[in-house]
From Swiss-Prot:
Family listed: Belongs to the class I-like SAM-binding methyltransferase superfamily. MenG/UbiE family.
InterPro entries in the cross-refs: MenG (IPR032904), SAM-dependent_MTases_sf (IPR029063), UbiE/COQ5_MeTrFase (IPR004033), UbiE/COQ5_MeTrFase_CS (IPR023576)
Gene for this chain: MENG
Listed name of the protein: 2-phytyl-1,4-beta-naphthoquinone methyltransferase, chloroplastic
PROSITE patterns in alphabetical order: SAM_MT_UBIE (PS51608), UBIE_1 (PS01183)
HAMAP family: MenG_phylloquinone_subfam, MenG_UbiE_methyltr
GO cellular component, one term: chloroplast
PANTHER family: 2-METHOXY-6-POLYPRENYL-1,4-BENZOQUINOL METHYLASE, MITOCHONDRIAL, METHYLTRANSFERASE
Gene Ontology BP annotations: methylation; phylloquinone biosynthetic process
Species assigned in the record: Arabidopsis thaliana
Length: 261
């Protein structure tokens, strides 16, 4: 359940993606810096906590998210809020050495972890990944540039979700999909209770061992402030997507939004 936080970050990248020629004014988003600090702080233990708290299930959920994206061999794809790189690595296996993966995150510490992990992997497809520090609500890419976009545990932490969805729509090619994995904000009281109980009695106590209790207490707050599956579908349609469907997975604890441009 650490993947539950949905973290992102930047480091020594394989290269900076050239900013497009369109003049785009950067806007400072309230609270984004505080969230960046939080994600930077947990970066060193993020992967270990993901495995421990989810009992390894986060790997299954991430594989599902990548499959729903429709990414295939030779594609140029984007992983937003890439964190330590799990989804980006899975995407690279889909697109192969003839494809390209961009992993973007606003946390430099998370990106540093991702770059280190990449350097230790032997498969040639992992060389097609490029890491870039950036903001999900102001993407440094051209219109209609990507064949697929993924986001794992990121939208919940974005201050302006509609703007982020509009940016994903903008950079996607027509007919392509975005796949967004995150905690599910359930309408079922039992599921909501169990989520809260797990965070209070499992996640936070384990995080306390790593001196990260306050950072992981944020998780419960962020889920409460997130959107239900139906609200996420509405958000995607409002952003311009032609269709959207939210899937509840892992007993309703997690959810995945799939939207088609």
């Amino acid at each position: 359940m650490a993947a539950l936080l949905g973290i992102v970050s930047p480091v020594t990248f394989t290269g900076k993606h050239p900013v497009n020629s369109r003049s785009r004014r950067r806007t400072v988003v309230k609270c984004s810096n505080e969230r960046r600090i939080l994600f930077n702080r947990i970066a060193p233990v993020y992967d270990n906590l993901n495995d421990l708290l989810s009992l390894g299930q986060h790997r299954i959920w991430k594989n599902m998210a990548v499959s729903w994206s429709g990414a295939k061999k030779g594609d140029y794809v984007l992983d937003l809020c890439c964190g330590s790189g799990d989804l980006a690595f899975l995407l690279s296996e889909k697109v192969g050495s003839t494809g390209k993966v961009m992993g973007l995150d606003f946390s430099s510490e998370q990106l540093a972890v991702a770059a280190t992990r990449q350097s230790l992997k032997a498969r040639s497809c992992y060389k097609c990944i490029e890491w870039i520090e950036g903001d999900a609500i102001d993407l440094p890419f051209d219109d209609c540039e990507f064949d697929a976009v993924t986001m794992g545990y990121g939208l919940r932490n974005v201050v302006d979700r509609l703007r982020a969805m509009k940016e994903m729509y903008r950079v996607l090619k027509p007919g392509s999909r975005v796949s967004i994995l995150d905690f599910n904000k359930s309408n079922q009281s039992v599921t909501t209770f169990m989520q809260g109980w797990m965070i209070d009695n499992v996640v936070v106590p384990v995080a306390t061992v790593y001196d990260l209790a306050k950072e992981y207490e944020y998780l419960k707050y962020s889920i409460n402030g997130y959107l239900t599956g139906e609200e996420l579908e509405t958000l995607a349609l409002e952003a311009g997507f032609s269709s959207a469907c939210h899937y509840e997975i892992s007993g309703g604890f997690m959810g995945n939004l799939v939207a088609m441009r």
